[in-house]
Amino acid sequence: MKITVSVIKADVGGIGGHTKPSDGLIEAVRHTVKSSGDLLLDYYIGYCGDDVHIVMSHTKGTDNEEIHKLAWDAFEAGTQVAKEEGLYGAGQDLLKDSFSGNVKGMGPGVAELEFEERPNEAFTVFAADKTEPGCFNYPMYRLFVDALSNTGLIVNKSLAEGVRFTIMDVEDGTIADLELWEDKPTLEAALMYPGRYVIAEIHTKEGEPIPVSYTHLTLPTILRV
């Protein structure tokens, strides 16, 4: 069965500046997500700095309107509490007045990964705040390019053959696919500039997704282990 992991984050208020969300704000987000009935298989609410992230597993696929609306409603509930408590930057990442089908382009950051679930499935969510959009460029490079850091690049045939990096230029919005090992110098040159060039996706050469990474100016990152 195909499972989708959706991670959607937003800054809707912080205590004393960009520090952390209040307990009341987190609880408002959690209550909204918990009230979603059987829409989700499971969920987790966390934060990094003053960014609240909602981790959801479901069977609706990526870019699903119901899933994105649930996250939007949860952040609106958190915003209401932030205003009542006088938190800093209440609702600042909600750039639109109403939901319009997908949170992309509306302020929140989104990372989603759809895959066939294995018997023992694991994934990791990387979260960061107040940093470069490409802050995870180097660790991802170490994982999928540097055999000194990951012996799987030697013993796993599909990884040994090289993977495909999708790189986004966040200044002009262009995207390029770079393949290992032929494009290694170009990839390394791009990843030296995390303020402009960002890993958007990594796939095997057969097209199997490995991680889904942050979009421009947003985090988080999902890594399927």
Listing of model-derived features with the role each one plays in the protein:
Residues 30-37, 54-113:
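A broadly used, surface-exposed interaction patch
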Residues 4-16:
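Catalytic-site or vestigial catalytic-site microsegments of nucleotide-handling domains
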Residues 108-174:
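Extended alpha-helical scaffolding regions
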Residues 37-48:
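Short, glycine- and small/hydrophobic-rich beta-strand elements in well-ordered beta-sheets
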Residues 49-53:
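Short acidic-rich active-site patches of cyclic nucleotide enzymes
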Residues 13-30:
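Conserved long alpha-helical elements within nucleotide-processing catalytic cores of c-di-GMP signaling
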Residues 188-194, 198, 202-214:
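Eukaryote-biased recognition of electropositive, low-complexity segments
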Residues 215-221:
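Conserved small/polar residues in nucleotide/adenosyl-binding loops
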